[in-house]
């Protein structure tokens, strides 16, 4: 089960292992490895250090070891301090470097430490095996450097402040897995719908978000949803959560892929930008030479320049926006509007309804 060359451990497993090592120390066993019960089975986890602080308190550290994944939490120290109490309750708290939830809609309510339900259960179940019926514990999880690392995660966007989240659903971190990242993206929708928002602005990333903020006279932060390279997944999640209208905004380079039904937009998986642009240019009457140049251009911005030379920019991007709406109507039940931008912030299509002073609908 345990192969550090292939899998890593989640921050939840690291926190659980550190808590278990702390408790075992208080029970008279100082362990350099612990066996942690996880949803995926038993994992053996190395303990960096464990120390007794007082008669009823100990702390231990587990390092989140590297594995084949660009995980920003790799090499962080996950420290759990355990104090045995005389009541059967196990309380779990966040310390230094563990974020605090500030917005409704996540798995943890506002005001609580960002330690998700599965890690909380793992800590409780693993400790309970070694506590008497009349004993409980206070567990404080801390992550030195967690606040600094958190700026490189989705936490600031999700309203989790002051540190990282203690996460995990299986106990193991799978290399190059997109599942956890997609789930963190979908949390944006949970936060928006928890506020009663049923009309959202979907953007590919930071450039699209900048366009949205500059375009609308007034818009709440939570209403702008970043899709990254997973528009299909994110749009399905929105549809399943009762979102009624989506305004799609972003740079042409990302959005035109949706017009061809490409709902996973990472270039290494699917590109087709030149084929899409050449096809719509030809449909709108571009000359053969222009279509050929578009097909051979290296960037979408160059393709836009070719269209401007023939005065076809608006017609071509109206055609692309229509194709996007058609694709969305085939798959989703919400209403859609589309605004396609160039890198310098110009709107390339004109067949949209959403104005700058748009009043968003809400359901409470």
Swiss-Prot record:
TM helices/strands, residue ranges: none
Annotated S-S bridges: none
Xref: InterPro entries: CbiD, CbiD_sf
Keywords from the UniProt entry: Cobalamin biosynthesis, Methyltransferase, S-adenosyl-L-methionine, Transferase
EC numbers on record: 2.1.1.195
Molecular function GO labels: cobalt-precorrin-5B C1-methyltransferase activity
Pathway stated in the Swiss-Prot or TrEMBL entry: Cofactor biosynthesis; adenosylcobalamin biosynthesis; cob(II)yrinate a,c-diamide from sirohydrochlorin (anaerobic route): step 6/10
UniProt KW rRNA processing keyword: no
One example of a Gene Ontology biological process annotation: methylation
Reactions that this protein is recorded to catalyse: Co-precorrin-5B + S-adenosyl-L-methionine = Co-precorrin-6A + S-adenosyl-L-homocysteine
Keyword presence, Methyltransferase: yes
NCBIfam families to which the protein is assigned, alphabetical: cbiD (TIGR00312)
Protein family according to the UniProt entry: Belongs to the CbiD family.
Protein name as it appears in the record: Cobalt-precorrin-5B C(1)-methyltransferase
The species this protein was found in: Methanothermobacter thermautotrophicus (strain ATCC 29096 / DSM 1053 / JCM 10044 / NBRC 100330 / Delta H) (Methanobacterium thermoautotrophicum)
Gene name per UniProt: cbiD
């Amino acid at each position: 089960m345990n192969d550090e060359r292939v899998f890593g451990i989640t921050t939840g497993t690291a926190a659980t292992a550190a808590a278990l090592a702390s408790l075992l120390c208080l029970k008279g066993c100082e362990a350099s490895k612990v066996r942690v019960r996880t949803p995926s089975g038993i994992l053996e986890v190395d303990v960096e250090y464990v120390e007794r602080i007082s008669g009823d308190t100990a702390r231990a550290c587990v390092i989140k070891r590297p594995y084949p994944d660009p995980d920003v939490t790799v090499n962080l120290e996950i420290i759990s301090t355990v104090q045995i109490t005389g009541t059967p309750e196990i309380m779990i708290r966040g310390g230094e470097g563990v974020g605090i939830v500030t917005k409704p809609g996540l798995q943890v309510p506002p005001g609580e430490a960002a330690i998700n339900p599965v890690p909380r259960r793992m800590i409780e179940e693993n400790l309970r095996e070694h506590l008497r019926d009349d004993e409980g514990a206070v567990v404080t999880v801390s992550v030195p450097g967690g606040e600094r690392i958190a700026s490189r995660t989705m936490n600031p966007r999700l309203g989790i402040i002051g540190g990282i989240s203690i996460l995990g659903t299986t106990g193991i971190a799978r290399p190059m897995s997109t599942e956890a990242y997609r789930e963190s993206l979908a949390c944006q929708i949970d936060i928006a719908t928890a506020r009663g928002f049923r009309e959202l602005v979907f953007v590919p990333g930071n450039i699209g978000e900048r366009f949205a903020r500059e375009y609308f006279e007034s818009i709440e932060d939570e209403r702008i949803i970043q899709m990254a390279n997973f528009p299909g997944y994110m749009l399905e999640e929105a549809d399943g959560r009762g979102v009624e209208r989506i305004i799609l905004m972003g740079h042409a380079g990302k959005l035109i892929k949706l017009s061809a039904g490409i709902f996973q937009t990472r270039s290494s998986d699917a590109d087709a930008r030149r084929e899409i642009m050449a096809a719509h240019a030809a449909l709108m009457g571009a000359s053969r030479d222009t279509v050929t140049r578009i097909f051979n251009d290296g960037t979408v911005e160059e393709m836009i320049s070719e269209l401007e030379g023939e005065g076809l920019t608006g017609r071509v991007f109206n055609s692309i926006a229509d194709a996007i709406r058609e694709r969305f109507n085939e798959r989703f039940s919400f209403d859609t509007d589309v605004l396609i931008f160039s890198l310098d912030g110009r709107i390339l299509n004109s067949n949209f309804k959403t104005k700058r002073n748009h009043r968003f609908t809400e359901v409470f």
